[in-house]
Amino acid sequence: MRRCSVAKRRALALLLCLLLLLCTACGGQAQEDAGALHCTVRIECSTVLAHMDDLKAGKADIVPSDGVLLPETTVAFSEGDTVFDVLQQVCRAQGIHMESTWTPAYNSAYIEGIGNLYEFDCGELSGWMYSVNGVWPDYGCSGYTLHDGDTVVWSYTCDLGRDVGALQGEPLTIPSRRCTRR
């Protein structure tokens, strides 16, 4: 009786090994990735290094010494994915804190903070901007659909984009904060 039990165990073990071999040969990451598109993503805040005096108290420790939160990283994405989708994906995968809100007026996500560095942390003109292939889109990141081979750079600006090359010679318009009483 015991002999039958040992034979059954061996047969079951062999069957499990064959199933595992079959699953790894047919499935796995390589096949999932085969039809995927790819882009590169970089997240940097090097402009803050020149404005450390303007940085909010307690924020100096979160700024990397080289200003790079995420070096250029290749990311697989699907057809129709946006810059926002890929930012969420890479931040989740790399353990980088990212916070956003939906802005109905622009029908897009607005990035409030990445790596615990938020808008206005380095002055009233500071915040996150993105470029794709060296171009700074004038619309939200969830409105930009990526293409295979795109290069996305998220940059923290301390001067409404001038310090990262987004506003080259364009006039700067800041809404008035004055209130008038009637």
Tell me what each language-model feature is:
Residues 2, 7-10, 21-182:
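Ubiquitin-like/PB1-type beta-grasp interaction modules and other compact soluble beta-rich domains
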Residues 12-15:
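Short linear motifs in low-complexity or flexible loops
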